[in-house]
Regions:
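Glycine-rich ThDP/TPP pyrophosphate-binding loop and its adjacent helix/strand module
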Residues: 1-134
Length: 134
């Protein structure tokens, strides 16, 4: 929902105009905002084309993949002629069954029991991820 705001696009235009090559930004493109799915509230697609139109180099990644995030940051540092936007396509609440992709959790904290359950699920997921990368 942040990119519904004019100040985001004013900054995008300025950075593109002046070719601020020391700017690397990351958009968490999770497709939700506090009021619901972003495309229902205020459609943004094609987001990549919008940033490119303002003179930015755009890298799109799976933002739930930490290695992809690290790789994209490395690639971004190697680009010297313009600002960089990394669009990280994410699933909000990834790994927590009762939170995953549910916009209601975007602005609501879990209660104590929900937090315990979420942390347990994330710890279990973390062990699986570590095992895949060892």
């Amino acid at each position: 929902g942040e990119q519904d705001e004019g100040n985001v696009w004013e900054a995008a235009m300025l950075a593109g105009k002046y070719k601020l090559s020391n700017v690397i930004a990351i958009t968490d493109r999770n497709n939700i905002q506090i009021d619901g799915p972003t495309e229902s509230v205020m459609p943004l697609e094609d987001l990549k084309e919008k940033w490119e139109a303002f003179g930015w180099h755009v890298i799109e990644i799976n933002g739930n993949d930490i290695e992809a995030v690290i790789d994209a940051c490395g690639m971004a540092k190697a680009i010297a002629e313009k600002p960089i936007m990394i669009i990280a396509h994410t699933i909000p609440g990834k790994g927590v069954d009762f939170m995953e992709s549910d916009f209601h959790w975007h602005g609501m904290p879990p209660d104590h029991e929900q937090a315990k359950k979420a942390l347990h699920e994330l710890r279990t997921l973390g062990g699986k991820i570590r095992g895949e990368h060892e």
